[in-house]
Design a protein with these regions (language model features):
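Binding-site signature for planar aromatic cofactors or substrates
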Residues: 2-232
Length: 232
């Protein structure tokens, strides 16, 4: 756990907790699950369900569609300099899909460990943003089109909760008329494990949430809306 000493005045100072614990919880929890599945380890239903708490925050928005919250899956992404390399590996794997091939998901897990969640891959990860997909184009989409201010709220029973504040960028090849690597990347990262369907990628715009602030809302003495130092 990292702390930063902030000088308040000539006579006193305070210690502020950094956002490191959020990323350990959100990224490492997902990583441990992926690595365990790749290793063929048994994971209880209870543990699997809890692991999704770091994957499925509420996306909060406000705009023409009113005040809204929607549960969406999120994922961390490679740094910009690693996007093309990672996407190329994902697409090669997706192109190999055969409905009769029972090894597709396992091979996808191996790629996720290699490029995202393995210990050697950590320096490749961009911890300034998270990505998601829009599958409905309803309230969230309408609001973020007009107002990019966004909050992502995470909760894991019974006590853990984190809040991210920032700006939501909508990335849509149908709007831009050009290749959008983040839209392809986020769709591919979803389909690298699940049954792929590249024909609907154009219908699924990407959200790129740029993190500006991190809060610990956990029901602990260090939580209850405590702002964490970010970046740290």
């Amino acid at each position: 756990m990292r702390y930063i000493i902030i000088i308040i005045s000539q006579w006193r100072s305070t210690i502020m907790k950094t956002a490191e614990n959020f990323f350990k919880w959100a990224f490492d929890t997902r990583g441990r699950t992926v690595i365990a599945l790749n290793n063929g380890e048994e994971i209880s239903k209870e543990k699997m369900f809890l692991s999704f708490c770091s994957h499925d925050p509420a996306f909060i928005s406000h705009g023409p569609a009113g005040l809204n919250a929607s549960i969406k899956g999120i994922g961390f992404l490679p740094k910009p300099e690693y996007l093309e390399e990672t996407l190329e590996a994902y697409l090669k794997h997706i192109d190999s899909f055969d409905p009769e091939d029972k090894t597709y998901s396992q091979r996808g897990l191996e790629l996720l460990v290699k490029y995202m969640y393995g210990p050697e891959a950590r320096d490749r990860i961009d911890f300034t943003c998270v990505g998601s997909l829009e599958m409905a184009k309803m309230h969230s989409y309408t609001n973020y089109k007009a107002n990019p201010e966004a909050t992502l709220l995470f909760y894991q029973p019974p006590m853990i909760s984190y809040e991210l504040r920032g700006k939501m960028e909508i990335i849509d090849e149908c709007d831009s008329g050009k290749r959008e690597i983040y839209q392809q990347m986020i769709n591919a990262q979803h389909d690298v494990y699940h049954r792929p369907n590249t024909s609907i990628w154009l219908d699924r715009p990407a959200y790129l949430f740029h993190i500006e602030e991190v809060y610990d809302n956990s029901a602990t003495k260090e939580g209850f809306g405590t702002k964490l130092v970010y970046p740290y």
